[in-house]
Amino acid sequence: MIDAESPTTAFRTKPAPVDPSLQHEIEQFYYWEAKLLNDRRFQEWFDLLAEDIHYFMPIRTTRIMRETAQEYSGAREYAHFDDNAQMMRGRLRKITSDVSWSENPASRTRHVISNVMIVDGEKPGEYHVSSVFIVYRNRLERQLDIFAGERKDILRRTGSEAGFELAKRTILIDQSTILSNNLSFFF
C-alpha cells in the first residue's frame, strides 16, 4: 500500500501480483503520458489529469540515518510543486506561451518510466501506482539536466480513450540539490 502521508515509503509490503492485463493497461497509460510530454502535446497531457489533481514534489534534504523519515518535506511544508488543477492550468499556459523565457526555445525531454508496481486503491477502479523515472532534458545548445526518482500516483479508471486519469502524483527525486536552471517541465 502506498503511504500517502510519508513520501519516503512507496509500499509498506510487497504488493500482491495484479492481473497481467491491468499491469499492461497501466504501463501503456504511462508510456502514452510520456509520449505526450516528450512531444510537447501538453494540452493532451493535461486532459489526462483529474479535476481534483494534486501534483506534489517535496523538497529532499540529506539526513543522517536516524533522521531518514524527515528526508522529504511533508504536507503543508515547502515543496518544489504543490499544485491543484488551477495551478496546473497556469503552468500549462506558461509553458505553452512564447513569452516564457524558461521554455523559449523549448526544452527537449525524454521520459523513461519503469518498475511499475500496482495495488488496488480504497475505491473501486482506483489504483495506487509506484514507478521509477529518468527525465532527460536538453535546452539551448549546452544545457543538460537529468532527473531520476520515483513517482507515487493514484490513477482512476475512466471511460476515456486513455482509460485512466491521474488524480494524484507525488514526485520523489533522488537529487537533494537541483542543479537545473528551472523546473519548467512536467514529470
From Swiss-Prot:
Inducing or repressing factors: Transcription is up-regulated by aromatic compounds including biphenyl, ethylbenzene, benzene, toluene, xylene, cumene, cymene, and chlorinated benzenes. Is under the control of the BphST two-component regulatory system.
An annotated Gene Ontology molecular function: biphenyl 2,3-dioxygenase activity
Gene3D superfamilies: 3.10.450.50
Reactions catalysed according to its record: biphenyl + NADH + O2 + H(+) = (2R,3S)-3-phenylcyclohexa-3,5-diene-1,2-diol + NAD(+)
Pathway noted in the entry: Xenobiotic degradation; biphenyl degradation; 2-hydroxy-2,4-pentadienoate and benzoate from biphenyl: step 1/4
Class of enzymatic activity (EC top level): oxidoreductase
Gene Ontology process terms (BP): 3-phenylpropionate catabolic process
Biological role: Part of the oxygenase component of the biphenyl dioxygenase system that catalyzes the stereospecific dihydroxylation of the aromatic ring of biphenyl, yielding a dihydrodiol compound. Is likely involved in biphenyl degradation that allows growth of Rhodococcus sp. strain RHA1 on biphenyl as the sole source of carbon and energy. Can also use naphtalene and 4-chlorobiphenyl (4-CB) as substrates, as well as some polychlorinated biphenyls (PCB) such as 2,2'-dichlorobiphenyl, 2,3-dichlorobiphenyl and 2,5,2'-trichlorobiphenyl. Exhibits weak activity toward dibenzofuran and dibenzo-p-dioxin.
Known partners and oligomeric status: Heterohexamer consisting of three BphA1 subunits and three BphA2 subunits. The multicomponent biphenyl dioxygenase system is composed of a ferredoxin reductase (BphA4), a ferredoxin (BphA3), and a terminal oxygenase (BphA1A2).
Family the entry assigns: Belongs to the bacterial ring-hydroxylating dioxygenase beta subunit family.
NCBIfam families assigned: PRK10069.1
Listed name of the protein: Biphenyl 2,3-dioxygenase subunit beta
